[in-house]
Amino acid sequence: MKILKSNPFLALANNYMIDAPEPSNISYFWNFGSLLACVLVIQIVIGILLACFYIPNMDLAFLSVERIVRDVNYGFLLRAFHANGASFFFIFLYLHIGRGLYYGSYKYPRTMTWNIGVIIFLLTIITAFLGYCLPANQMSFWGATVITNLLSAVPFIGDDLVHLLWGGFSVSNPTLNRFFSLHYLMPFVIAALSVMHLIALHTNGSSNPLGVTANMDRIPMNPYYLIKDLITIFIFLIGINYMAFYNPYGFMEPDCALPADPLKTPMSIVPEWYLLPFYAILRAIPNFQLGVIAMLLSILVLLLLPLLDFSAIRGNSFNPFGKFFFWTFVADFVILAWIGGSHPENVFITIGAIATIFYFSYFFILIPVYTILGNTLIDLNLSSIKR
């Protein structure tokens, strides 16, 4: 134990992972941070191995992925773990964000931690999209064409930005080279931001379900929460092994098994399942520029939460209005994901528009209103007690 505190590097790890004081009442909802760190390390290691065999060329990219699966030793496992690892990463990311929303982790003094987390979320979406485009299959080719065209919504220079990103007049070899380089780089940027996220968290410590400062009742990270984290990590490893061995392509569209054909459009162009809610918001607004703005705002609105929540109490544990509207918001998010994966027919367009309106209403109307109402009820109760 002496070397853990005398060695500067081990002392740093000791302060963050062993002797770190944590609230004694945090539940398994606080395990998603360690799960995300575990998945990120796995994704980086497997991604480096896959990059050794991938060829960023429109004619050879699809064949190189097929060669990885068929000819490279355990290549089929590498691809299955990497593809399904992305899905697990987003599952844990959404649960992590949802826990932060419910328990008010964005409120002072953890605002900086929250803001860094939102930036990580945005970069993760970009990284996932870049990786989705790399196999150059039918769905990823047309997905890349559609999503990169969103840059044309930028006034005056939009078309030039699209051509700059493409490296030509369509998705081609320069595009894949750019996407491959950025997809290789971004996980390391995310890892660096994750360290910043951890440093910011360590400054004030973790929150807890009660939403109160727990400096008087803390226990060390090791062995209590370290063992608890290992339990969920083992459960995750069981889950990803099941997906990799028994259902490796369960999250993929059938068109992902076809090579890219620039002359034939798929029946329905959809992104991966974890981006469907934002795709639904994009499609719900008829105006192209407003749709792009709404899609970006649906992510960046998370940065505004510390300014929109006026509650004197952190979190929704003791807020019945907050509980009701939070779970309604979760249902709305699931509906948006369903609409994003459906064909843009009249009934789905209408449902998507209603779900989009509620999505933004939750942040800009409902949260300010019910937090102010909650404060008013607390003040009235306190004033009646004083009398």
UniProtKB/Swiss-Prot annotation:
What residue ranges are annotated as transmembrane? 32-52, 76-98, 113-133, 179-199, 225-245, 289-309, 321-341, 348-368
Task: Read off the Pfam families from this record.
Answer: Cytochrom_B_C, Cytochrome_B
Membrane topology is: Multi-pass membrane protein
- Give the binding site residues for a ubiquinone: H202
Which cofactors does this protein require?
heme b
Which BP terms does GO give this entry? Answer: mitochondrial electron transport, ubiquinol to cytochrome c
The cofactor binding remark recorded in the entry reads: Binds 2 heme b groups non-covalently.
According to the UniProt entry, the coiled-coil residues are none
Q: Among its keywords, does the record have Glycoprotein?
A: no
Question: Which positions in this protein are listed as binding heme b b566?
Answer: H96, H197
Gene Ontology terms for molecular function: metal ion binding; ubiquinol-cytochrome-c reductase activity
The keyword Electron transport belongs to this UniProt entry's keyword annotation: yes
Q: Name one GO cellular component term.
A: respiratory chain complex III
InterPro entries per record:
Cyt_b/b6_C, Cyt_b/b6_C_sf, Cyt_b/b6_N, Cytb/b6-like_sf, Cytochrome_b, Cytochrome_b_N_euk/bac, Di-haem_cyt_TM
Q: Which residues does the annotation say bind heme b b562?
A: H82, H183
The UniProt family comment states: Belongs to the cytochrome b family.
| The protein's role, per its UniProt record | Component of the ubiquinol-cytochrome c reductase complex (complex III or cytochrome b-c1 complex) that is part of the mitochondrial respiratory chain. The b-c1 complex mediates electron transfer from ubiquinol to cytochrome c. Contributes to the generation of a proton gradient across the mitochondrial membrane that is then used for ATP synthesis.
Q: What is this protein called?
A: Cytochrome b
Q: Gene encoding it? A: cob
